Amino acid sequence: MISCKNLCVLRQLPLKNCRRHYSAIQSSAALLSVRPTKWTPKPAAAGGAVSAWQQRTTAKQHQQQQRRSLFSSSRMQAKDYYATLGVAKNANAKDIKKAYYELAKKYHPDTNKDDPDASKKFQDVSEAYEVLSDDQKRREYDTYGQTTENMNRQGAGGAGGFGGGPFGPDGFSQNWQFRSTIDPEELFRKIFGEGNFRSNSFDDFADSKFGFGQAQELVMDLTFAQAARGVNKDVNVNVVDQCPKCAGSKCEPGTKPGRCQYCNGTGFETISTGPFVMRSTCRYCQGTRQYIKYPCAECEGKGQTVQRRKVTVPVPAGIENGQTVRMQVGSKELFVTFRVERSDYFRRDGADVHTDAPISLAQAVLGGTVRVQGVYEDQWLNIEPGTSSHRKIALRGKGLKRVNAHGHGDHYVHIKIEVPKKLSQEQRALLEAYAELEEDTPGQIHGMAQRKDGSKKATAGASETKTDAQPAGRTADSGSQGTSRAGAETESAKGQQSEKSETRRKDQQTGGESGSGGGFLNKIKSMFN
């Protein structure tokens, strides 16, 4: 026989009140390799008193059984917030917010009145976003399957001897039920506005306290003149800055933080879950070793709040469309991207600008000056005689200011000759006279006949067209008036034909002393005499 005492020593079993005996036939090796699945002390005799050790042993076994069952059911019933939002566990904050943005619109009760489960789905999506959008809550959820706020609700006691552990006051695991601190409807209104889905609601949501809590980017609209000359513009942005009430101390004014009572000021805690022991950063002080008994009511003990501020953004002169500048706002950085409107007059090419300058036919032939609008001031442009259309004239240094370099760009002016569409009788007569004197005309001119000697003369119907360049399809009355006028002009042209020939012969004989212009002036004088 193996004594009960030796058997208990080998198996590390308690000796007190042990009355069990084992047969020597059983192999000692088998006894050492197979431990009884359940050991219970021999009950006391009827009417006998139960010892304190027996009571503690029975209670401990009961607690272990309850702990296994409840802890397993808690894990099985825990919600997978990543699956709720349809994102991966390594998804960044932008992907999480985008997923919530789409699902919130999809499952909102106002847009799914026929779906009885829409309200429940909308609540689940809001719960998942509230936890995963907060870095601290997400870290705690990934580690423990719940957050500190919910663990605090479970009461003191539990693993490691610290309150708020994964087990309740009796050492039993409790199933975590989410308790949102933000109304899902309020969160939805912050995103989409009141009563409608705005096109820019997602941008507003990013600047709200339910988004990232920080105005990281801002798009500013500018006119061309504002971008060219520079301007200071005031904008309202949401920034995360030091709490004005507690000045960043996280405590109510007049109070101070004390040593963390959960980690004893070490910043770490030890959590025991069955046979496993884990040492990690304290969940209550986050490694700061301090415990805030009276947290600030304004910032809820975070030391920072989302504040609406009016910020003056200095727009540099010459800024281009799509450029981004960085500026400091409190303790954070604000990135401002500029969106410059197109100008109806200026065409921009970097620091250079291009404009069109219309000039008359006389200015193009004889030369002159024209006033053009510049970027910063008007400029007088000199037109040389014989300037052709689409000629490009450069005004050096009159363009836009270079943002990242010294100096200015150039202003290029493109000449546009405006041909008159309506001519008076005198203007048409002058042009016909000039056409007769023109010698290098490519092709033919309407209303001009070619002589044998190479000269040109106006035909009978050359001047019959009205000064407003009326088309050929006229009414009967206008046609009759044009016919009578054409007959009169034909007789006048015949009477002047001999005079034209004589004038041309005199010009040729004089060797061009007065130039072709002399014959041209005589022609004009004869037409108006």
Curated annotation (Swiss-Prot):
Subcellular location as annotated: Mitochondrion outer membrane
Stored InterPro entries: Apopto_cytoskel_mod (IPR051938), DnaJ (IPR012724), DnaJ_C (IPR002939), DnaJ_domain (IPR001623), DnaJ_domain_CS (IPR018253), HSP40/DnaJ_pept-bd (IPR008971), HSP_DnaJ_Cys-rich_dom (IPR001305), HSP_DnaJ_Cys-rich_dom_sf (IPR036410)
Residues annotated as transit peptide in the record: 1-22
Top-level taxon: Eukaryota
Listed SUPFAM superfamilies: Chaperone J-domain, DnaJ/Hsp40 cysteine-rich domain, HSP40/DnaJ peptide-binding domain
Ranges of residues in domain J: 80-145
Binding site for Zn(2+) 2: 260, 263, 282, 285
Residue ranges, annotated region (Disordered): 441-529
GO CC annotations on file: cytosol; mitochondrial outer membrane
CXXCXGXG motif repeats mapped onto the chain: 243-250, 260-267, 282-289, 296-303
Any single Pfam family the record assigns to this protein: DnaJ
GO molecular function: ATP binding; heat shock protein binding; patched binding; unfolded protein binding; zinc ion binding
Disulfide bridges in this chain: none
Residues reported in the UniProt entry to bind Zn(2+) 1: 243, 246, 296, 299
Range of residues in the leader sequence: none
Bias (Basic and acidic residues): 497-508
Entry protein name: DnaJ homolog l(2)tid, mitochondrial
Naturally occurring in which organism (per UniProt): Drosophila virilis
Lineage: Eukaryota, Metazoa, Ecdysozoa, Arthropoda, Hexapoda
